[in-house]
Amino acid sequence: MKIIVVEDEIRIREGIRDLIDMMEGEWEFAGEAENGEAGLELIRSIHPDVVITDIRMAKMDGLEMLEAAREEGIDVKAVVLSAYSEFEYARTAMKMGVTEYLLKPVSIDEFFKALEHIRTQIEKEKQQQPDMLGSLEQ
């Protein structure tokens, strides 16, 4: 599964990339961007399974980026990282279907659990797709 990271702080991007590289299995670090505009371009070109994004960034914030991708019909799971515990951010993220909302600093354990949760969701959705196609054919 392909993951991209959209984060304005280079040290955080590098740290996340290193964590993904450490993980064994089907996770592949597929790219990174430093703001929402560049992140949206990356989403369009790579079509990742998962986007890990900050909220507040220059040019376009993470939630705007995810909303723009969804409006274009790009279905992607998202992990939102935020230094802000304001409820409004979390509520907006939940309304958009964000899979995980993690507060910085994120522990390694939290990060791995979030990705495992997403992996499980993706697998369940893939198993349900043939069932849905079969019911449409009847």
What is the meaning of each model-derived region?
Residues 94, 98-100, 106-138:
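Interdomain helical linkers/hinges and coiled-coil/dimerization scaffolds
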Residues 7, 54:
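Active-site residues of response regulator receiver
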Residues 10-31, 45:
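Two-component/phosphorelay signaling modules centered on CheY-like receiver
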Residues 32-41, 62-65:
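Helix N-cap/capping motif at the beta->alpha junctions
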Residues 57:
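Receiver (REC) domain active-site loop signature in two-component systems and cognate sites
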Residues 64, 85-100:
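Alpha4 helix (beta4-alpha4-beta5 surface) of REC/receiver domains from two-component response regulators
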Residues 51, 78, 93, 101-102:
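Two-component signal transduction core modules
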